[in-house]
């Protein structure tokens, strides 16, 4: 007799949908549990069996929490804007609006086949104008805000304007002007100053340009697309940026508030990259015509300043043309052109050959003015990091060492150590060769020497102690069609303004030609009627911004919209936000450890500053599921032909088999290979469960109204205890193993005690909900078990009356026996000697020593 899974699963999926079984009562007085999956990008390929792993894990926990009396919010939606969707549309020749809808429909169908308990009434898509209305609203708030360094929070740009009107730029780390000068600035001059403070601003910067994709990529995106075979080069462009760096300290500090995997916390810390050091200027031998007096650098090793033998400026640094002598101009320009064809990843490759060109210019070392230092350009220095220039200390930095060896530059050791074949970097050795008429740090350790150099530089007003971050501002604009339109308008007067909030959403126009232009201009530039905009307050005619937002924009705040998805006035009702935030559990791939998680934390902190949310962090607990590999133990890929489609697995074995197997494969966070034989094994287990409740035919359901025996209650409550412990800890594999032990214990028996087996059905329900619902119904219950109380273990049945004692002879395991829990030493040794196997070993031997470890083992030492 086989479990009729097709019939059962079809019935219950339809039942849950018709009865809206998993709709959240958002205003419930029950304790809340917000369980969230990272919503998927709906690709044309659909799901493979790796996708349901995380979804099944959150579903088990959501079902468990409902049965524990929680009001559960467990939604699903679609991250559907962005480059992948547009590329798919270009490959198929079908408009992305159509392909995206078709892909979403397919994803939804596949997800619903798995029996996941989502509240589909809250389904959302980032491409829905009712959704991106508020993505655009958040953008406008960012544009109209600045970060007050004194308060360490965002404020309205109007507060900054008031400050300038009252006291000028006094107290800010900015070029100084007074209130009268501010009032006399033109509107364009004022806007340029405000742009230096806005959380959204435009800048002419070297960007990662991909010709094949026709767009720029954020630094964090380059590795992914280069890995896919696309060429990415550096190209100067005027781009919209988000000042995420203003929040660097808070992004770092508030990692203490969350329960995330240590590896993810470390990745975020490293990406933010906080470091303390010295910012100092190395003066030119004579000032430049522009008035520039020197090259500013930042170093975390002020103690090595006497070891500087050359300086390096990034090839794309704006001062390169100024500092290059006529004799070196051709070589420098050729090198700049060559380096622009390389991505940052290529340039930062540690093992690559070092290249560079001398600019013809010299500076002197401020700590030792007698030292004349040549200034080079080299692509191992990036303009986007630090100041875009470095002081090179080849004796104590490996890249500088290799560069110096390549070009025959001096290598001066200033820290005790061996540098014959490689740079020697140490913070424990003392300084040598570090003395001049200005200052001496010889004999000092790293801490003392660095402190002395910083104090000296500050007293001379040539440098200052500074905290630096590796984190760069977020490159926000994309020269693509399929994204949220940026709600800004550029006017001939030189001023840029957002459209009125009452005009949101700014809807993406329906263009038939959506391919990139190849010129760096967005396809939206072709929407002539859409481009022109008349300012409702001034009547001035302007041009809309044609770049679109990156894919990450919509995913920065979607967790808030699930709480209140139909609200047309605000992104989320404040009362509901206070009740439901933060997200209790967030599950998704570790590939999002930096990008999505960092961007969403940034937006959330901004929303916290303006009072739109009540929590400092969006996601309390984070779990990363491990990859499921193909049966060949390689990552699933169409090109490798090892993709397993969940549709096929469900068709042959059922959704409960897929769910159980993926949770039984091993710990959730581990990488695991797919196994068809493993699915077959789990399918056999479900059939054994079915037969446990049926005697002979599909209609012969059996539960007996008999009192359970103490042994039956022991195995039940041991199982209850184990499952209750394992589900919150995501130890689903061991919980399922315990359910299997239960079935093994009961299968040989002819007894089917109702009280015991009904509890087992409830224990099974989070893992295999279809079969559990069917068995519950067949037991005579009129309601779905989704909200039944989850079983609790009775402590009296968890106490073991017997213990297992192992028997060793000369330290080798020979046998074991059960004994009363309070067995005495003499009785335990006697019982061990009377075991048949032990009697045989002891025959003719002398027992020299008897050892008893209470409750664990007997060891007999014989001669």
Swiss-Prot record:
What positions does the record give for the motif labelled 'KMSKS' region? 635-639
Q: Which reaction does it catalyse?
A: tRNA(Leu) + L-leucine + ATP = L-leucyl-tRNA(Leu) + AMP + diphosphate
Q: Which GO terms describe its biological process?
A: leucyl-tRNA aminoacylation
Could you tell me where this protein is found in the cell? Cytoplasm
Which Pfam families does the protein's record reference? Anticodon_1 (PF08264), tRNA-synt_1 (PF00133), tRNA-synt_1_2 (PF13603)
Q: What is its EC number?
A: 6.1.1.4
Motif: 'HIGH' region; annotated at 40-51
Which key words tag this protein in UniProt? Aminoacyl-tRNA synthetase, ATP-binding, Cytoplasm, Ligase, Nucleotide-binding, Protein biosynthesis
Q: Which residues form a coiled coil?
A: none
The protein's matches in InterPro entries, at most eight in alphabetical order, are given as: aa-tRNA-synth_I_CS, aa-tRNA-synth_Ia, Leu-tRNA-ligase, Leu_tRNA-synth_edit, M/V/L/I-tRNA-synth_anticd-bd, Rossmann-like_a/b/a_fold, tRNAsynth_Ia_anticodon-bd, Val/Leu/Ile-tRNA-synth_edit
The UniProt annotation places ATP binding at: 638
- Molecular-function annotations in GO: aminoacyl-tRNA deacylase activity; ATP binding; leucine-tRNA ligase activity
Superkingdom assignment: Bacteria
GO CC terms, sorted: cytosol
Is Methyltransferase set as a keyword in this record?
no
Q: Which HAMAP family match?
A: Leu_tRNA_synth_B
Family to which this protein belongs:
Belongs to the class-I aminoacyl-tRNA synthetase family.
- Identify this protein by name: Leucine--tRNA ligase
Q: Which gene encodes it?
A: leuS
